[in-house]
A protein has these predicted regions:
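Domain-level recognition of soluble alpha/beta enzyme cores
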Residues: 121-162
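Short, surface-exposed amphipathic charged segments that create phosphate/polyanion-binding patches used
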Residues: 91-97
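Alpha-helix N-cap/helix-start capping motif
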Residues: 56-60, 110-111, 138
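Glycine-rich phosphate-binding loop signature in dinucleotide/nucleotide-binding domains
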Residues: 44-46, 97-102
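Residue-level preference for the first positions of well-ordered beta-strands
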Residues: 4, 103-105, 141
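Active-site-proximal alpha-helix that buttresses catalytic centers in soluble enzyme cores
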Residues: 2-81, 85, 89, 125-126, ...
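Charged phosphate-binding loop/patch that engages nucleotide di/tri-phosphates or the phosphate backbone
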Residues: 157-173
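A glycine-rich beta-strand to alpha-helix segment
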Residues: 102-121
């Protein structure tokens, strides 16, 4: 069993219209939401074995505010392939993870994260897949338990969404 944490970056700022998409920072609301998610991770003792993060400014800032929750010892890799990647690209990257890792967190962007979550998750009765399909807002975390022993075996329908937490669920939006 492998556990995958898919975290969409928190709300970004559109104040400076001259910035490239890659360079947009978090908004005030986004900073608060990312901090609240870090506290949620700490409360629930969610500590991934590895973090793969888009190098975009808003994803890096989101991760910085989570680090109190997951701790500084978690290895983090900033990978350009995660920036604005589609689901097949993200899946290919995850399949290359070291099998000694029981869990991994992907901090990235939509629509790729949402598409990946929906592809990996089989239909389920708990309603979380339907909730996520309706909207995977900024600052949200989807937890997927994949019924595989090796990351290379990740494929559509191999997992189930065991938790879906939005910033608004934490009182941060």
């Amino acid at each position: 069993m492998k556990t995958l944490y898919l975290l969409r970056h928190a709300k970004s700022s559109w104040k400076d219209s001259g910035l490239e998409d890659f360079d947009r920072p978090l908004s005030k609301r986004g900073r608060a939401a990312a901090k609240a998610m870090g506290e949620y991770l700490a409360r629930h003792r969610i500590v991934p074995a590895q973090v793969l993060c888009s190098p975009a400014k808003r994803t890096r800032e989101t991760l910085e505010r989570l680090q109190d929750g997951i701790g500084p010892a978690v290895p983090v890799r900033f990978e350009k392939v995660v920036y604005m990647a589609d689901a097949p690209t993200l899946l290919r990257r995850l399949r290359r993870l070291n099998d000694t890792l029981a869990s991994a967190m992907l901090v990235g962007h939509n629509p790729g994260l949402e598409q990946l979550a929906l592809a990996l998750a089989a239909e389920e009765e708990n309603g979380l897949r339907r909730e996520l399909a309706a909207k995977f807002p900024t600052g949200s975390l989807a937890v997927i338990e994949a019924d595989v022993e090796r990351w290379a075996d990740l494929k559509p329908g191999c997992g189930r969404i065991t938790a879906f937490t939005r910033a608004k669920d934490l009182g941060a939006e």
